[in-house]
Amino acid sequence: MRIQSIALILLALCGQAGAQQAAPPVFSLWPEGAPGAEARRAEPEKVENTYVSNIHNPSLTVVKANSRHANGAAVIVVPGGGHRMLVWNNEGMVAAKSLNRVGVTAFVLKYRLARDPGASYSIENDAAADLRRAVRWVRAHAAEYGVDPHRLGVMGFSAGGELVSLVADNPEPGLPARQDAVDKLSARPDFQVLVYPGPLGVPARSVQNAPPAFIVAGSLDKCCMPPALGLYQQLVGAGVSAELHLYAETDHAFNMGQRSERLSDVHWPDRLADWLSDSGWLIPHDGKAPLGVPSPAQ
């Protein structure tokens, strides 16, 4: 009986540990509510399958890299969904776990949805403000999560890519009206990753100061291949380091490759990992590779 009791206790502890792993911490970007959304911040989000909508309290979900592999780099993941919903799993958590594999700690953003029925938000003024606040928030809390505030990137899918372009490649409309210590930090990311980005924000208006970019899209994507190509040409023309991958016979929403049978699509996250490594974002400033991460030559 005693052995059975011990076994039951161990099973319970394992179950608790699994539950903790399945529920990463979530933090509101504005403790008192996002500007203009204070009255609706307590409304519950709507979750249908793996899609999230009715977001009035913007937040970050923290998905930490394993301590043996973490190298101090951080990326804010911005899911798409046409500004009506968020493709939370395939363009959020799956992307975060993929980044974890190369030692990057991820922060998945829930932002206000301008095209959600009943919403009064705008993409340029509210959703983009949520991403800017997220960049500042991660910098303010960098020490808590063991990340380098100078190796912070943003990664956006489709509509999320529009927010990335608005924030990284276009001038900030000025400091927020309601300032706190977080708002005083820079909202400019150190690098940007655009995955079949939407057309809003392209052509960009401030590419001379834009951060280095990795851009990926499908050649059959009538919506988002043209802005991907156009932004790449604009960045390179302004002397900004940029890398573009356009995949043949590929349309929109191939996510992290898991929705395609084409090997080139399946392996595009490896090309992103190569770019992150080649650009130096995965190397701590002390020059020492983290334990458990092989060098590119291995």
Regions found by a protein language model. Name each.
Residues 26-27, 33-52, 56-59, 64-71, ...:
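Serine-hydrolase catalytic machinery in alpha/beta-hydrolase-like enzymes
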Residues 215-217:
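Short beta-strand/loop motif that positions the catalytic acidic residue
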Residues 79-84, 158, 219-221:
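Active-site glycine-rich loops that stabilize anionic/oxyanionic intermediates
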Residues 1-7:
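Bacterial N-terminal signal peptides that target proteins for export
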Residues 238-298:
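C-terminal catalytic histidine-bearing segment of alpha/beta-hydrolase fold enzymes
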Residues 129-210, 289-297:
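Primarily recognizes the serine-hydrolase "nucleophile elbow" in alpha/beta-hydrolase
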Residues 14-17:
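N-terminal signal peptide c-region/cleavage motif recognized by signal peptidases
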Residues 222-228:
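Conserved alpha/beta-hydrolase "acid-adjacent" motif
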